[in-house]
Design a protein with these regions (language model features):
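Catalytic core of non-heme Fe(II) oxygenases with the double-stranded beta-helix
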Residues: 101-236
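Non-heme Fe(II)/2-oxoglutarate
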Residues: 2-101, 157
């Protein structure tokens, strides 16, 4: 389903796969300002300070910034307004908070989230998993693609499957050590194996409902020095 949205943005939504897409989230000038600012932020490797087991050792470790929050999330880092170009993103989400809250089945006052910038170079991806929170479940997740351009053969697609896992991890599963308590699932847990994908189109916001089984396809060698650049985070 596709509907019109203010400021030339469009919304696509799938109940079957649990996603919402908002294209053209920011104006061209605002996206460029945010891109320039975020690229100058400080990045570090995922798992530099604590082990997030969703990041399998063979999938590569993305680079990310420190977190920023909208609302009281209990997370460290600045909270909106941050007096930086990150506020362009926060404000754009705030303008569409009614549609987002409705999709996540929340009241508008319940929409709180934490966000960080992520960089994936060629060869880096993220294995199949569902997002789970610390001590409490996430209310949803999102990714906003911030790179200037992206070609179809460069990989980095968001892959989504219906939740068709019926078997527990076997004791001899190579992924068992990384799967326990993390939301990480090996391909052997997927029975039907039919899903959908979303291209990392620039200026596109993708929102996922909780318990959506998904992965990030590794960025292809054809991308060269072009990195998959996004803002991503969780509704809490």
């Amino acid at each position: 389903m596709t509907v019109s949205c203010e400021e030339n943005a469009t919304i696509q939504q799938s109940e079957a796969f649990g996603y919402m897409i908002i294209d053209d989230l920011l104006s061209t000038d605002d996206r460029r300002r945010l891109h320039r600012h975020a690229m100058q932020d400080s990045f570090f490797y995922e798992n530099s300070f604590e082990w997030n087991r969703v990041w399998h050792p063979l999938s590569g470790m993305a680079l990310l910034t420190g977190p920023k929050s909208f609302g009281e999330t209990g997370k460290p880092g600045p909270r909106y307004p941050t007096d930086s170009p990150y506020d362009l993103f926060f404000a754009a989400i705030k303008r569409r908070i009614a549609a987002i809250a409705d999709f996540l089945r929340l009241n508008e006052s319940e929409v709180k989230y934490v966000v960080a910038a992520y960089l994936y170079r060629s060869g880096w991806g993220l294995p199949w998993h569902e997002d789970i929170g610390e001590q409490a479940e996430y209310m949803g997740a999102f990714t906003y693609y911030l790179h200037d351009h992206w070609r179809g053969n460069w990989g980095g697609e968001l892959m989504i499957l219906r939740d068709e896992r019926h078997a527990d991890a076997s004791a001899d599963s190579i992924d068992l050590a990384f799967a326990q308590g993390t939301g990480l699932h090996s391909p052997s847990h997927v029975e039907n194996g039919v899903g959908t994908f979303i291209m990392p189109k620039p200026n596109r916001l993708v929102i996922l409902r909780p318990h959506v089984l998904h992965s990030v396809k590794p960025v292809a060698d054809l991308a060269g020095e072009n990195m998959r650049f996004s803002l991503a985070g969780f509704y809490v």
